[in-house]
Amino acid sequence: MIQMQTNLDVADNSGARRVQCIKVLGGSKRKYASVGDIIVVSVKEAIPRGRVKKGDVRKAVVVRTAKEVRREDGTAIRFDRNAAVILNNNNEPVGTRIFGPVVRELRAKNFMKIISLAPEVL
């Protein structure tokens, strides 16, 4: 459950280390984002010589949440920390590597590039 002002780790090699959610996309009254939802983020911490800089405003897709994700078969999956992957304007990942596991729900939302780059899909 990601809302405005939520800090997230960045799970790719785009150069950002930590981002803050500044908007949940998908309707003017929408308050929360879950796994697979696109949000607008501000880069709060970045590494030198990365593709994104501190202060950049980018789109990102949520790939891990501390709030559990319930599935059709009754199982639930949750993570220790919230994480996102930075996207470009075509909703493709800026980075070329994904760190850590991602959830299967991204496949239904057509983030195939992230699924293929991820080391583990849960």
Curated annotation (Swiss-Prot):
Q: Which InterPro entries match?
A: Ribosomal_uL14, Ribosomal_uL14_bac-type, Ribosomal_uL14_CS, Ribosomal_uL14_sf
Task: Provide the alphabetized UniProt keywords.
Answer: Ribonucleoprotein, Ribosomal protein, RNA-binding, rRNA-binding
A GO BP annotation: translation
SMART domains given in the database record: Ribosomal_L14
List the GO cellular component terms: cytosolic large ribosomal subunit
Kindly list the GO molecular function terms attached to this UniProt entry: large ribosomal subunit rRNA binding; structural constituent of ribosome
Q: Does the keyword rRNA-binding apply?
A: yes
Tagged with keyword DNA repair: no
Family under the similarity heading? Belongs to the universal ribosomal protein uL14 family.
Show the NCBIfam families listed in the entry: rplN_bact (TIGR01067)
Its subunit composition reads: Part of the 50S ribosomal subunit. Forms a cluster with proteins L3 and L19. In the 70S ribosome, L14 and L19 interact and together make contacts with the 16S rRNA in bridges B5 and B8.
Main function: Binds to 23S rRNA. Forms part of two intersubunit bridges in the 70S ribosome.
Q: State the protein's name.
A: Large ribosomal subunit protein uL14
Where does this protein come from, organism-wise? Answer: Ruegeria sp. (strain TM1040)
Tell me the lineage of the source organism: Bacteria, Pseudomonadati, Pseudomonadota, Alphaproteobacteria, Rhodobacterales
Q: Which gene encodes it?
A: rplN
